[in-house]
Amino acid sequence: MNNKSVLTRIKNWNLLLPVVSLLLVMAVNIIHDAAIGANPLSFFMITLRQTTGNGTILYGRIIDILNRGSEVAILAIGMTLVVSSSAGTDISVGSVMSLCASFCCMLLAGYGVSSTTTLAVPLIVGILGGIFIGVLCGMFNGTLVAYFHIQPMVATLILFSAARAIGLLLCNDLIVYVRNEAFGFFGGYIGVIPTAFVIAALCIIVTSLFLKKTAMGMYIQSVGINPKASRIAGLNSKRMIFMTYTVCGLFAGIAGIVAASRITSADSNNIGLYFEMDAILSVALGGNSLGGGKFSLAGSIIGAYTIQAITTTLYALGVSSTQAPVFKAIIVILIVAIQAPPLRAFFKRRSAAKQVKGAAA
């Protein structure tokens, strides 16, 4: 195998963009730590630390990234399928997260109760109730996009605007606290490992196995590439698009439960805030085209944790939480620009010209 073929394979690797982005974030952390006189490799250090609430746990920046980035990773699974099938995005996932968290905590605490340590209903009822609301929201979005042919961004803008308000109504404009050990488990630790990361890993594994063991992944990509041709070939394009939005709502519900459990409360104003942007950015950073079609779930997951690594790095560099979205928006613009057909065609022409020139020489 010659050097040219190796370079070609690297250039065509679908995980090139997320892996390079992650390596760049690591490099920035190493340089920053060295500049302030800290251990340049402190970013990679993982230790055991004793805590009052969770006992002995794994501690370190990488562990924090894996823990804090789990909700976005869960959202990125559903967002990847939505983008692939409909060439659109679900901008309601952050608000749906908030609504699911509010409904779950309202069930667990009891309507009108602002704080409790005892559960009004069994824990499983509250958890499934919150997830069910997410599924309903996904079905609502899927119906508008697939059957009413409304543009995805416009269709999901409805719940983007309304879901948080509905959550506030359910909680009587209050932050509902559920200070219960069983409920807090989902935002805590299993042994030394963050529970949120375990839940995210299970969601990723189950989805990956489902897509690989069935033809569903191929069907979704086919619908995203050409819905008319897929319909002629016998696929129900509308049903496939409806299903992906429903699944996206399901994962938004799971992410909402994890987020609420992490803070043992339903804060409708803040849970899932800007998470839709992070989920979309994860898909784009994962090397997936926002124009639909072929997708890489692994790329989206790497992209999700890269986004969290970027967020952690920005905070370490002194960027405030209100300024961080500006930097993320710049990254989105750059990624979308790189994926733009005219720019990609330009680079292909340059590459072809170099090959012709090399052959002539």
Where is each model-derived feature located?
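Cytosolic-side transmembrane-helix boundaries in multi-pass membrane proteins
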Residues: 1-44, 228, 232, 236-239, ...
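Single transmembrane alpha-helix segments in multi-pass membrane proteins
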Residues: 29, 58-111, 145-148, 283, ...
